[in-house]
Amino acid sequence: MDFINLNKVYPKDSYPLPKIDKLVDATAGYALLSFMDAFAGYHQIPLCPKVQEKTAFITDCGLHYHRVMSFSLRNAGATYQRLVNKLFEPLIGQTMEVYVGDMIVKSTVEEDHSSDLQKTFEILRAFNIKLNLKKYVFGVR
């Protein structure tokens, strides 16, 4: 789907993405790290009806529109980052770092890692966020 024209007229969301080098630095010195990736992260965010209308397209079967965010929408990255920052706010900087759909759970003490992961999974479950089962690594030293 080509959203070039829609992206031209839609105002840019200037919500900042985290700096990768700062995220890497924020994981230094931890006993255990776990890496996870949201499964088709953008497609897990429903679009409001007003925005859905703007994504309409015609096929042989009639008029259709996107019900979930598309990767190619101008503000997809900023919207997703704002969402995960809000959802994981109590954990970010403490036991977790998030860059769009990529999540790192970090523990200073190995014995706390299961508990730190559990808190993350509880939030993921509460908001029905699915993980990519092909893109995860748990318990990296």
Predicted segments, located by residue:
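Retroelement reverse transcriptase polymerase core
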Residues: M1-R141
